Design a protein with these regions (language model features):
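Short, Lys/Arg-enriched N-terminal segments with co-localized hydrophobic residues
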Residues: 15-26
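Extreme N-terminal starter segment of soluble prokaryotic enzymes
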Residues: 27-31
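Gly/serine-rich nucleotide phosphate-binding loop at the start of the catalytic core
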Residues: 33-44, 49
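Glycine-rich phosphate- or other oxyanion-binding loops that anchor nucleotides, phosphorylated ligands
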Residues: 56, 60-286
Length: 286
């Protein structure tokens, strides 16, 4: 369990030790952040649990190929995302009931999930990789993503015939519902919007951890959506009871939204099947 700062010890232990022609190689440790269980579900379906013989089983630790994965479901909104990232990356203690984490600094952070398209050139279900993420506040700097990790991710997807567009994203505390909202955000230079990436990238940068964002476009500027902003609490997180009321008052729009989200996530799942076991996250080893 993480208590305080991330341990600096990067010794080789357990399943992270492999010998190849006399060389000792360490598995890459990747923290994968998702806002909801639905968005994190592909990771659990693709990866496997701790291998047999692991003497230190850890709740939430998965394996895919030569990568050790920890799925962190942080919740909707920038405040929850920031708090969960600070916990996971060791800046604040984990609650006693929370998951324990590997006792070493991750090699990379990967943020996954849905995003909204701000440009008509981005169709629904398009996979996107962020180059940078902008804040809403003009007094904050953009957060760049790892060029090395992002390039590897995009190259692997293209090599398997899957289109992945490099984009600038922006993180908003509110859901961009109307076309006018999305066009206003597009003036920043961003092509997609989400509610969590900027805060997680900022914490990862503070921790000195390479980070990338891989999302899928769930809606476009012309999409007609239910007003889920009415279901957000003061912290920008989704209130389940209020969300139910929105669903009851806009049943057709909500059904279309859920169907579209499910379809988009199926496309992202195909991308993650290629990325999670791949050698994309070794920037910190070089």
């Amino acid at each position: 369990m993480v208590q305080g700062g991330i341990p600096g010890d990067r010794a080789l232990t357990g399943e992270s030790r492999e010998s190849v022609e006399g060389l000792v190689l360490r598995m890459s440790l990747v923290y994968i952040f998702a806002a909801s269980k639905m968005e994190g579900q592909p990771v659990e379906q693709i990866a496997v649990g701790n291998p047999e013989g692991d003497s230190t089983p850890r709740l939430g630790t998965l394996r895919s190929g030569d990568n050790e994965l920890v799925l962190v479901v942080g919740g909707w909104g920038h405040k929850k995302a920031a708090a969960k990232a600070r916990e996971a990356l060791g800046f604040t203690p984990f609650p006693s009931e929370s998951q324990s984490l590997p006792g070493r600094k991750p090699d990379a952070v990967l943020i996954i999930g849905l995003c909204g398209g701000l440009s008509s050139s981005l169709p629904q279900n398009r996979i996107v990789a962020y180059t940078d993420c902008l804040p809403i506040e003009s007094n904050k700097p953009p957060q760049p993503c790892s060029v090395t990790v992002t390039n590897k991710v995009v190259e692997i997807l293209y090599s398997h015939g899957m289109t992945c567009e490099r984009v600038v994203g922006i993180t908003s505390p509110r859901i961009a519902i109307r076309r006018d909202d999305k066009l206003a955000l597009a003036k920043s230079g961003a092509k997609v919007v989400d509610m969590e990436s900027y805060e997680i990238l900022a914490v990862a940068a503070q921790a000195g951890v390479s980070a990338a964002v891989l999302r899928v476009v769930a809606d476009t500027p012309d999409s007609i959506m239910p007003d889920l902003n009415r279901a957000l609490n003061q912290d920008g997180a989704l209130d389940d009871r209020k969300a139910l009321w929105v669903a009851l008052t806009s049943p057709i729009r909500m059904a279309r939204l859920l169907s579209g989200n499910k379809r988009a996530m199926s496309h992202l799942a195909k991308a993650l099947e290629l990325i999670l076991p791949a050698d994309c996250f070794t920037e910190a080893h070089n």
